[in-house]
Amino acid sequence: MTSPENVRRVACVGAGVIGGGWVAHFLARGYEVTAWDPAPDAEPRLRRLVEAAWPTLTRLGLAEGASTDRLTVTDTLEQAVADAEFVQESAPEKLDLKRDLLARLDAATPPGVVIASSTSGYPMTDMQTTAADPSRLVVGHPFNPPYLIPLVEVVGGERTAAAAVAWASRFYEVAGKSVITMDNEVPGFIANRLQEALWREALHMVASGEATVRDIDLSITEGPGLRWAVMGPMLTFALAGGEGGMAHMLDHFGPSLKSPWTRLAAPELDKELYDAVVAGCDEAADGRSIADLVAERDRGVVEVLRATGRLGPEEDSR
């Protein structure tokens, strides 16, 4: 098995928004990337995505030798993984599809090469059931877009080797990611669980007429989101306790956890709520296209990363 520090060739299977984002990230880090997707328009769509992401990646800092010319789109899955030293799967979130695809990847990928799934919620235990060698299958869950958001959550399944989890975690670190290595499988992992709680509350407030989509977005971007970008919710709450820290925070505000504020059960996504949320987002876009909004988001995240000192000097171990 190639060491994480010496990987040169990465295969990306699935080239949609997430898979394409991975392709862009790995290219920017100087890897040779082979990609495969069964969609007939996969290659031009993927190359457009990479081209659109490249200015942002350039601002973030490219590794030595990084080039979009290092991308090869293959005709078959088998061609994509034939010489791969790491495989990132990013197929649609359908359990049977993931299960079958991981089994195919396991059969086609050279022995010992770690295969990671970008699944946003399925436990690897449920996906590795038909693979001949489930020991090398791990979850490597990114955040959209993978070329911009540093976080990756890594966790294995019941039949995954601990060495594969450790290898994947180290590889992602070498590839410029911020890694959480989870000891236990949790449906939805960590960050999505937290996002989901906020999302449910937001939908309830829109459904009940308590807040508009604009109100909800502003409440985060102009409020706690600014603090969370620096140190996260837990440490932010600790600061709210003053010199007493989190202990004082819990003593003072802990009882309010039992207040009937939250409605953590999912709301009924009826037509009225659906239309209200869609209309609110259209209003917030104010005529800007999705491409315009993506570019605006990317510029903003780069500036947040720069302002919080997370861009650092360019590093390249390849």
Swiss-Prot record:
It is an enzyme of class 1 (oxidoreductase). NAD(+) binds at residues 14-19. The keyword Cytoplasm applies. InterPro entries: 3-OHacyl-CoA_DH_NAD-bd, 3HC_DH_C, 6-PGluconate_DH-like_C_sf, 6PGD_dom2, L-carnitine_dehydrogenase, NAD(P)-bd_dom_sf. GO terms for biological process: carnitine metabolic process; catabolic process; fatty acid metabolic process. Pathway: Amine and polyamine metabolism; carnitine metabolism. It comes from the Bacteria. Coiled coil: none annotated. It is found in: Cytoplasm. One of its GO terms (molecular function) is NAD+ binding. It catalyses: carnitine + NAD(+) = 3-dehydrocarnitine + NADH + H(+). It holds the Pfam family 3HCDH. Its EC number is 1.1.1.108. Keywords: Cytoplasm, NAD, Oxidoreductase. One of its GO terms (cellular component) is cytoplasm. SUPFAM superfamilies: 6-phosphogluconate dehydrogenase C-terminal domain-like, NAD(P)-binding Rossmann-fold domains. Catalyzes the NAD(+)-dependent oxidation of L-carnitine to 3-dehydrocarnitine. Belongs to the 3-hydroxyacyl-CoA dehydrogenase family. L-carnitine dehydrogenase subfamily. Homodimer. This is L-carnitine dehydrogenase. It comes from Streptomyces coelicolor (strain ATCC BAA-471 / A3(2) / M145).
